[in-house]
Amino acid sequence: LGLSPAEPDTCLKTPRSGRKHVAWADPLSLAEVKVCARALRGTANDVLLCAAAGALQRHFLATGEATPECGVRVAVPFNLRPMRQPIETLGNQFGLVLVTLPVEETDPIMRFRQVQENMNRLKRSYQAQVTYSLLDLFGRGPDVLERRALSMLSNKASAVLTNVPGPKEPVYLAGAKLNQPMFWVPQSGNIGIGLSIFSY
């Protein structure tokens, strides 16, 4: 992770202005995403990451900027808490992994295969556990160490992308059903782009 080269300067890595712009897409059918995943012998997460790569590719084409030939790296929070473990205390338990999205690949099936291969490689690695331990260690030290660690990590990625599994049953607030909950993933360091996916 520390030996990974810094991300190249692209339209995704411009200096931050201090202002946020938000946008969201119409919801996708999770059932259809799962059908695609089964047909391609992958996971729903692979399908969604492939779609994110396609969206970033279209963004590069729309801005007229050359699409990076080696893909775009995104920082992805990787859950380290067992899914069936009861949650006794509030808080997150995740490590960050760097995922390369093949934005240069125009064939969607080939793009999917590359995403799938990248994700399978990460699942076999200890990158998430290492970053979790390092960030925990730096978080206990002086602020300057934590800021330097976050700065180093943020130089390795062009965006943050997270896929949060939501509740499997409808959620109600004061008797009103929540139809389309959404959230925005926080960014740190010099990362200005956040891609948030929520299953509900």
Locate predicted features.
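Soluble acyl-CoA-dependent acyltransferase catalytic core bearing the H(X)4D motif
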Residues: 1-191, 197-200
